[in-house]
From Swiss-Prot:
Matches recorded under InterPro entries: Biofilm_formation_YgiB (IPR009576)
Biased composition (Polar residues): 204-223
Protein name: UPF0441 protein YgiB
Pfam families, A to Z: DUF1190
Family: Belongs to the UPF0441 family.
Region of interest called Disordered, as start-end residue ranges on this chain: 178-223
Domain of life: Bacteria
Amino acid composition bias (Low complexity), ranges on this chain: 178-195
Length: 223
Protein backbone atom coordinates (compact mmCIF):
# COMPACT_ATOMS: atom_id res chain seq x y z
CA UNK A 1 0.00 0.00 0.00
CA UNK A 2 2.77 2.40 0.87
CA UNK A 3 4.42 1.61 -2.42
CA UNK A 4 1.19 2.22 -4.34
CA UNK A 5 0.64 5.52 -2.54
CA UNK A 6 4.18 6.57 -3.40
CA UNK A 7 3.67 5.80 -7.08
CA UNK A 8 0.39 7.67 -7.22
CA UNK A 9 1.96 10.62 -5.42
CA UNK A 10 4.79 10.78 -7.94
CA UNK A 11 2.29 10.55 -10.78
CA UNK A 12 0.32 13.42 -9.28
CA UNK A 13 3.45 15.59 -9.05
CA UNK A 14 4.31 14.83 -12.66
CA UNK A 15 0.83 15.69 -13.91
CA UNK A 16 0.73 18.86 -11.80
CA UNK A 17 4.06 19.99 -13.23
CA UNK A 18 2.95 19.36 -16.79
CA UNK A 19 -0.30 21.27 -16.30
CA UNK A 20 1.25 24.26 -14.56
CA UNK A 21 4.61 24.68 -16.27
CA UNK A 22 3.26 24.76 -19.81
CA UNK A 23 1.35 28.07 -19.40
CA UNK A 24 4.39 29.54 -17.62
CA UNK A 25 6.65 28.53 -20.47
CA UNK A 26 4.23 30.06 -22.96
CA UNK A 27 4.10 33.28 -20.96
CA UNK A 28 7.90 33.51 -20.84
CA UNK A 29 8.12 32.90 -24.58
CA UNK A 30 5.54 35.62 -25.19
CA UNK A 31 7.51 38.11 -23.09
CA UNK A 32 10.68 37.40 -25.06
CA UNK A 33 8.81 37.78 -28.35
CA UNK A 34 7.36 41.12 -27.28
CA UNK A 35 10.76 42.32 -26.09
CA UNK A 36 12.24 41.30 -29.42
CA UNK A 37 9.59 43.28 -31.29
CA UNK A 38 10.15 46.35 -29.12
CA UNK A 39 13.91 46.22 -29.75
CA UNK A 40 13.63 45.46 -33.45
CA UNK A 41 15.75 47.51 -35.81
CA UNK A 42 14.70 50.14 -38.31
CA UNK A 43 15.68 50.29 -41.98
CA UNK A 44 16.75 53.81 -42.94
CA UNK A 45 18.15 55.52 -46.01
CA UNK A 46 21.00 58.03 -45.96
CA UNK A 47 20.80 61.13 -48.16
CA UNK A 48 22.90 64.25 -48.59
CA UNK A 49 19.95 66.52 -49.40
CA UNK A 50 16.34 66.60 -50.57
CA UNK A 51 17.34 66.19 -54.24
CA UNK A 52 19.13 62.91 -53.50
CA UNK A 53 16.07 61.68 -51.65
CA UNK A 54 13.69 62.72 -54.45
CA UNK A 55 15.82 61.00 -57.08
CA UNK A 56 15.73 57.77 -55.08
CA UNK A 57 12.01 58.08 -54.29
CA UNK A 58 10.06 59.26 -57.36
CA UNK A 59 6.73 60.75 -56.39
CA UNK A 60 7.82 61.58 -52.84
CA UNK A 61 9.51 64.93 -53.48
CA UNK A 62 7.33 66.73 -50.93
CA UNK A 63 8.09 64.17 -48.22
CA UNK A 64 11.81 64.36 -49.02
CA UNK A 65 11.82 68.16 -48.77
CA UNK A 66 9.91 68.09 -45.48
CA UNK A 67 12.26 65.50 -43.98
CA UNK A 68 15.32 67.47 -45.13
CA UNK A 69 14.05 70.75 -43.69
CA UNK A 70 13.13 69.05 -40.41
CA UNK A 71 16.61 67.54 -40.25
CA UNK A 72 18.15 71.01 -40.74
CA UNK A 73 16.09 72.36 -37.84
CA UNK A 74 17.10 69.40 -35.70
CA UNK A 75 20.74 69.99 -36.62
CA UNK A 76 20.50 73.60 -35.44
CA UNK A 77 19.09 72.38 -32.14
CA UNK A 78 21.35 69.40 -31.43
CA UNK A 79 24.66 69.89 -33.31
CA UNK A 80 27.83 70.45 -31.28
CA UNK A 81 28.38 74.19 -30.73
CA UNK A 82 31.73 75.96 -30.51
CA UNK A 83 32.63 79.33 -29.04
CA UNK A 84 34.90 80.16 -31.99
CA UNK A 85 35.06 79.36 -35.68
CA UNK A 86 38.63 78.09 -35.19
CA UNK A 87 37.50 75.45 -32.70
CA UNK A 88 34.83 74.20 -35.09
CA UNK A 89 37.18 74.16 -38.10
CA UNK A 90 39.81 72.26 -36.09
CA UNK A 91 37.23 69.52 -35.56
CA UNK A 92 35.37 69.42 -38.87
CA UNK A 93 37.68 71.03 -41.42
CA UNK A 94 37.71 74.21 -43.48
CA UNK A 95 34.40 75.10 -45.13
CA UNK A 96 32.45 72.74 -42.86
CA UNK A 97 31.28 75.23 -40.23
CA UNK A 98 28.61 77.90 -40.02
CA UNK A 99 27.35 80.42 -37.50
CA UNK A 100 24.56 78.91 -35.44
CA UNK A 101 21.27 80.72 -34.80
CA UNK A 102 21.24 82.31 -31.34
CA UNK A 103 18.10 80.40 -30.36
CA UNK A 104 19.45 76.99 -31.42
CA UNK A 105 19.30 75.26 -28.04
CA UNK A 106 22.03 77.21 -26.24
CA UNK A 107 21.54 78.49 -22.72
CA UNK A 108 21.50 82.33 -22.49
CA UNK A 109 24.73 82.50 -20.45
CA UNK A 110 26.60 80.43 -23.05
CA UNK A 111 25.19 82.56 -25.85
CA UNK A 112 26.58 85.62 -24.08
CA UNK A 113 30.03 84.02 -23.68
CA UNK A 114 30.19 83.07 -27.35
CA UNK A 115 29.00 86.48 -28.49
CA UNK A 116 31.64 88.22 -26.35
CA UNK A 117 34.45 86.12 -27.83
CA UNK A 118 33.53 86.02 -31.50
CA UNK A 119 30.17 87.68 -32.04
CA UNK A 120 28.38 84.32 -32.35
CA UNK A 121 28.95 80.59 -31.88
CA UNK A 122 29.62 77.97 -34.50
CA UNK A 123 28.37 74.55 -35.54
CA UNK A 124 29.20 72.02 -38.28
CA UNK A 125 27.21 71.95 -41.49
CA UNK A 126 24.74 69.09 -41.78
CA UNK A 127 26.51 66.58 -44.04
CA UNK A 128 23.46 64.39 -44.62
CA UNK A 129 20.51 62.83 -42.88
CA UNK A 130 18.89 59.52 -42.11
CA UNK A 131 15.30 59.03 -43.19
CA UNK A 132 12.97 56.28 -42.00
CA UNK A 133 9.41 55.55 -41.04
CA UNK A 134 7.90 57.28 -38.04
CA UNK A 135 8.03 55.27 -34.82
CA UNK A 136 4.65 53.79 -34.00
CA UNK A 137 3.78 53.00 -37.60
CA UNK A 138 2.79 56.49 -38.70
CA UNK A 139 2.34 57.35 -42.35
CA UNK A 140 5.05 60.03 -42.35
CA UNK A 141 8.82 59.88 -42.10
CA UNK A 142 11.32 60.41 -39.30
CA UNK A 143 14.69 62.01 -39.87
CA UNK A 144 18.00 62.43 -38.08
CA UNK A 145 20.75 64.91 -39.07
CA UNK A 146 24.24 63.57 -39.69
CA UNK A 147 27.61 65.31 -39.49
CA UNK A 148 31.02 64.49 -40.94
CA UNK A 149 34.56 65.82 -40.57
CA UNK A 150 36.94 66.70 -43.40
CA UNK A 151 39.89 66.84 -41.00
CA UNK A 152 41.95 63.61 -41.28
CA UNK A 153 43.04 64.01 -37.66
CA UNK A 154 39.47 63.79 -36.36
CA UNK A 155 37.87 60.45 -35.33
CA UNK A 156 34.81 61.67 -37.28
CA UNK A 157 36.82 61.99 -40.52
CA UNK A 158 34.96 60.58 -43.52
CA UNK A 159 32.19 59.15 -41.33
CA UNK A 160 28.54 59.94 -40.78
CA UNK A 161 27.87 60.63 -37.10
CA UNK A 162 24.81 61.87 -35.25
CA UNK A 163 24.76 64.69 -32.71
CA UNK A 164 25.80 62.33 -29.89
CA UNK A 165 28.88 61.15 -31.80
CA UNK A 166 27.52 57.74 -32.78
CA UNK A 167 29.14 56.47 -35.97
CA UNK A 168 27.04 55.23 -38.91
CA UNK A 169 29.83 54.30 -41.28
CA UNK A 170 31.30 56.01 -44.32
CA UNK A 171 29.88 59.40 -45.31
CA UNK A 172 28.40 58.05 -48.53
CA UNK A 173 24.82 59.13 -49.31
CA UNK A 174 22.42 56.78 -51.06
CA UNK A 175 23.05 53.89 -48.68
CA UNK A 176 20.38 51.91 -46.87
CA UNK A 177 21.20 50.43 -43.49
CA UNK A 178 19.60 48.91 -40.41
CA UNK A 179 19.79 50.86 -37.16
CA UNK A 180 18.19 50.53 -33.70
CA UNK A 181 14.92 52.41 -33.42
CA UNK A 182 16.55 54.62 -30.80
CA UNK A 183 18.79 56.02 -33.55
CA UNK A 184 15.84 57.96 -34.94
CA UNK A 185 14.71 59.34 -31.58
CA UNK A 186 15.17 63.12 -31.06
CA UNK A 187 18.50 64.00 -29.47
CA UNK A 188 18.91 66.41 -26.53
CA UNK A 189 19.36 70.07 -27.38
CA UNK A 190 22.91 71.40 -27.12
CA UNK A 191 23.06 73.72 -24.11
CA UNK A 192 26.83 74.27 -23.74
CA UNK A 193 29.77 74.85 -26.05
CA UNK A 194 32.18 72.02 -26.87
CA UNK A 195 35.92 72.41 -26.37
CA UNK A 196 38.21 71.89 -29.34
CA UNK A 197 38.43 68.17 -30.07
CA UNK A 198 35.62 67.36 -27.65
CA UNK A 199 33.22 66.03 -30.26
CA UNK A 200 35.95 63.85 -31.76
CA UNK A 201 36.52 62.33 -28.34
CA UNK A 202 32.80 61.51 -28.15
CA UNK A 203 32.98 59.83 -31.57
CA UNK A 204 36.01 57.78 -30.49
CA UNK A 205 34.31 56.66 -27.26
CA UNK A 206 31.09 55.74 -29.08
CA UNK A 207 33.05 53.74 -31.67
CA UNK A 208 34.86 51.84 -28.92
CA UNK A 209 31.54 51.05 -27.23
CA UNK A 210 30.03 49.90 -30.53
CA UNK A 211 32.98 47.58 -31.24
CA UNK A 212 32.81 46.20 -27.70
CA UNK A 213 29.06 45.56 -28.00
CA UNK A 214 29.54 43.85 -31.37
CA UNK A 215 32.29 41.62 -29.98
CA UNK A 216 30.19 40.65 -26.96
CA UNK A 217 27.24 39.81 -29.21
CA UNK A 218 29.43 37.67 -31.47
CA UNK A 219 30.87 35.73 -28.53
CA UNK A 220 27.38 35.15 -27.13
CA UNK A 221 26.13 33.81 -30.46
CA UNK A 222 29.14 31.52 -30.68
CA UNK A 223 28.53 30.12 -27.22
Amino acid sequence: MKRTKSIRHASFRKNWSARHLTPVALAVATVFMLASCEKSDETVSLYQNADDCSAANPGKSAECTTAYNNALKEAERTAPKYATREDCVAEFGEGQCQQAPAQAGMAPENQAQAQQSSGSFWMPLMAGYMMGRLMGGGAGFAQQPLFSSKNPASPAYGKYTDATGKNYGAAQPGRTMTVPKTAMAPKPATTTTVTRGGFGESVAKQSTMQRSATGTSSRSMGG
